[in-house]
Amino acid sequence: MKLRSVTYALFIAGLAAFSTSSLAAQSLRFGYETSQTDSQHIAAKKFNDLLQERTKGELKLKLFPDSTLGNAQAMISGVRGGTIDMEMSGSNNFAGLSPVMNLLDVPFLFRDTAHAHKTLDGKVGDDLKASLEGKGLKVLAYWENGWRDVTNSRAPVKTPADLKGLKIRTNNSPMNIAAFKVFGANPIPMPFAEVYTGLETRTIDAQEHPINVVWSAKFFEVQKFLSLTHHAYSPLLVVINKAKFDGLSPEFQQALVSSAQEAGNYQRKLVAEDQQKIIDGMKEAGVEVITDLDRKAFSDALGNQVRDMFVKDVPQGADLLKAVDEVQ
């Protein structure tokens, strides 16, 4: 009888040990391209804190900044294949999987930041998220890259004509590449991790990232001029492997989504708060900041050429553009 009791006690203890180990914290590998000084990394740490708080430490993130897990395309492939759990990158990187994502690279699409946020946080944003689910990706939230501006080492850019012949690094979006070709520039897509060296060696003259990225990546060290063109608003997508997400409990799923969204709102605020400090810092570093430019002249130079291209390439393109324009 004693032996049976001891055996039973050991069995129960073993079950408890197994249960405890099975509930040990799950770690999700989360990669992105920007540095540890960028708002993206700062907000990613908050995301992790919120997630652990809401899951009592049972679900957490392991952060991989600085392109540690590869460039955006490599990380997206990794997430789809299940070798990486999560990644964060610009919307342009998903257009090859879902052409509707090209909507977000149509220049001068949004009137202002509030219009961009309301669009992304509403039905249009939900429809774009849904377009990736069949590709093995679940979009948890939209974070902020920001308004794209032009820096270069050649001369001040004040008008569209000033872009003529400029070798400018662009992202891989067909919309963005087409826009700079219309301006007369020579757009050169290039992985983010190669941009600093490209600017330093004059392989390229210019680039067009939001200024918070220009600052954290130190592009200003190898550029002379910053023109606040605000030619496009660039969101970030925080994505997770769809099968991984579906395998989590409903409680963990909710914690993941709510934490990503709250951290995203925090990151948007960080970007807004940093703008003037970054501009001042660039001026102190010797960069000439051009604010007296006519953004309407840039928009007028494009006309509807890029919008028409989007409508031609995407069956529901006209409806999507109309939906964005109608957001108040």
Swiss-Prot record:
Gene Ontology CC terms: membrane; outer membrane-bounded periplasmic space; tripartite ATP-independent periplasmic transporter complex
InterPro entries referenced in this protein's UniProt entry, alphabetically: DctP_fam, TRAP_DctP, TRAP_DctP_sf
Secretion signal, residue range per the UniProt entry: 1-24
Subcellular localization: Periplasm
GO biological process, one term: carbohydrate transport
Single GO MF annotation: carbohydrate binding
Keywords linked to the UniProt accession: Periplasm, Signal, Transport
Family according to the record: Belongs to the bacterial solute-binding protein 7 family.
Subunit note: The complex comprises the extracytoplasmic solute receptor protein YiaO, and the two transmembrane proteins YiaM and YiaN.
NCBIfam families, alphabetized: dctP (TIGR00787), TRAP_S1 (NF037995)
Function comment: Part of the tripartite ATP-independent periplasmic (TRAP) transport system YiaMNO involved in the uptake of 2,3-diketo-L-gulonate. This protein specifically binds 2,3-diketo-L-gulonate. Is not able to bind either L-ascorbate or dehydroascorbate.
Protein known as: 2,3-diketo-L-gulonate-binding periplasmic protein YiaO
Lineage per the UniProt record: Bacteria, Pseudomonadati, Pseudomonadota, Gammaproteobacteria, Enterobacterales
